[in-house]
């Protein structure tokens, strides 16, 4: 009987340390690129719940995301905000490393980021920023560096 309790507790501990793949996405009704980003996240193995709101400002501000980093959609996963067109590998890394942070952000809508692809394949350089609880940021990942 003791072994069964030990195994049950071990399984529970493993389940608690496994990062979630359940992403809640807040978006406005007119955002088309948001749907492309959601498809990118689903292809990477995330399940999504979509909430359509007239404004995302209260979602961001209530969780500590600075307005200066705002984009067209906001994700919430395991207590972290994912602001804008953040690539799935960056979210996976965030969940694995679990930094003391509000989340990650790709401010604006850089061409070539997930959901902002162009038919011509144009890609702008951009950074994924780690947003610290103080509101400060640091570069978390760099994408599409200039040739």
For the regions a language model picked out, list residue spans one by one:
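N-terminal, post-signal-peptide region of Sec/Tat-exported proteins
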Residues: 35-78
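Secretory pathway export signals and precursors
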Residues: 10, 27-30, 68
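Local sequence-structure signature of Cys/Sec-based thiol-disulfide redox active-site neighborhoods
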Residues: 20-38
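Stable alpha-helical elements in mature extracytoplasmic
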Residues: 30, 37, 52-55, 87-91
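N-terminal export signals
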Residues: 1-16
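Active-site-proximal beta-strand/loop segments in catalytic clefts of secreted hydrolases
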Residues: 26-28, 53-54, 85, 107-109
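Short glycine-enriched loop/turn motifs at secondary-structure junctions
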Residues: 17-19, 76
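Thiol/selenol-based redox catalytic cores and closely related redox-interacting motifs
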Residues: 62-147
């Amino acid at each position: 009987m003791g072994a069964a309790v030990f195994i049950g507790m071990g399984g529970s501990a493993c389940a608690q340390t496994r990062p979630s793949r359940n992403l809640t996405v807040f978006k406005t009704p007119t955002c088309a690129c948001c749907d492309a980003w959601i498809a990118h996240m689903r292809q990477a193995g995330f399940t999504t719940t979509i909430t359509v709101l007239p404004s995302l400002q209260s979602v961001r501000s209530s969780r500590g995301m600075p307005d200066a980093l705002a984009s067209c959609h906001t994700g919430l996963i395991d207590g972290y905000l994912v602001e804008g067109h953040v690539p799935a590998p960056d979210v996976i890394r965030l969940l694995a490393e679990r930094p003391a942070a509000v989340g990650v952000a790709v401010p604006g809508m850089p061409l070539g980021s997930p959901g902002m692809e162009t038919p011509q394949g144009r890609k702008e350089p951009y950074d994924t920023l780690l947003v610290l609880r103080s509101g400060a940021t640091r570069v978390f990942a760099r994408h599409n560096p200039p040739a």
